[in-house]
Amino acid sequence: MIMRMTLTLFVLVVMTAASASGDALTEAKRIPYCGQTGAECYSWCIKQDLSKDWCCDFVKTIARLPPAHICSQ
């Protein structure tokens, strides 16, 4: 029973995280300054309290070049 509840909780957390990242991607495409340069988009992403690694991947996902001095490390 405890294992079943743990699995259910894990699934809910994963679904919520996936939904949040999808929402951020949708929102970024709507924001004009996020579409201009990778650096501007990265800056917007960081202001959303997302991690550095996530933002670097996010900028690459929307076909922009992330800031090399931050994302190459």
UniProtKB/Swiss-Prot annotation:
Tissue-specificity statement: Expressed by the venom duct.
GO CC terms in record: extracellular region
A GO MF term: toxin activity
Disulfide bonds: C34-C41, C45-C55, C56-C71
Compartments reported by the entry: Secreted
Keyword Transferase appears in the UniProt entry: no
N-terminal signal peptide: 1-22
Note: Negative results: does not affect (up to 50 uM) the Nav1.7/SCN9A channel, Drosophila Shaker channel and rat KCa1.1/KCNMA1 channel expressed in HEK293 cell, as well as on whole cell current of neurons from neonatal rat hippocampus and prefrontal cortex. In addition, no detectable effect is observed on either action potential amplitude and duration or Na(+) and Ca(2+) current amplitude and kinetics when im23a is tested on action potentials and depolarization-activated Na(+) and Ca(2+) currents in rat DRG neurons.
Protein name (record): Conotoxin im23b
